[in-house]
Amino acid sequence: MKKTLLFIALIPFAFASYAQQDEEAEIQDDLLRSKKGHLILPESGDIALGFDATPVLNFGLNLVNIMNNTGHTAQHPGYVSGFNQVIVAKYFLEDNMAVRGKLGINSLTEKTTTYFDDPLSDATTNIPELEDVYKEKNNEVIFGGGLELRRGHNRLQGFYGGELLLARSAYKETYEYGISYNQTNEDEGLVFGGANRPLDYKQTTFGLGLRGFIGVEYFFAPKMSFSAEFGWGLGFSKDSRGTETREFWDDPDGTGTNSYRTEEFQGATQVSFTGFSVDNGSTSAIFGGSAALSLLFHF
């Protein structure tokens, strides 16, 4: 009798549990899926990685003449101002909310070597060569982070939000010379009293920006999408005065004998920018990074 009463008492809970499972199944069925049953839109906990979609679009524009570049391009002067070499990542806190980050590390080194015969060599053939070497280095690091809110139906999603951007760049020039400043080279007529020349030049730039954005994203395959984004940036950028080191062969103390010395000089000017810009083709990542076309993959 007790077992019968217990069974009857549990019937409502069984029906409630079944109804809840059925409701969850219906919600699950309402999610947008591909023909193979794969979810198309991102979910809470997903990670997205994106990059510049311009090369893909340029390839499509040139399909009519695949062996040549017809000159058609998806990029305009203001395209992804300062962000064309930046990785974009997102983490979905919720189905319709994501934190996003940007990271760009760009480095360029250029070296120019000029060769010439050693003027002090007595050789008539196979004359030894000396070289002047000029190096130019440019390093840039860009960090960005923000919050993205999303809404929409089916494959087309809209998004909007804001992000904070930090950038730092360092520029350096160095010079190395085949003919040194010394007494021997002065005696040979290769160096003259009062001569001077640069050894290196250094300058850094710091930038800070606050940017709002709005855009649309279309999922052409499960967890794969193209996005178009437009933004407005409020930014500040400041260059250091820069420092230059020069070497001298002279007689600053009036002793009657030239000697070698180096001296460092501060730059005469310092440049800073503050402003609000929108898709204006600015070369600074802090002033906009406005229009953007991206290809994104969600995992």
PLM segments and residue spans:
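Residues on the lipid-exposed face of transmembrane beta-strands in outer-membrane beta-barrel proteins
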Residues: 51-53, 87-91, 105, 143-151, ...
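Outer-membrane beta-barrel channels and translocator barrels
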Residues: 44, 94-96, 151-156, 219-221
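Bacterial Sec-dependent N-terminal signal peptides
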Residues: 1-24, 295, 299
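Short, contiguous, well-ordered secondary-structure segments
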Residues: 35, 40, 140-146, 150, ...
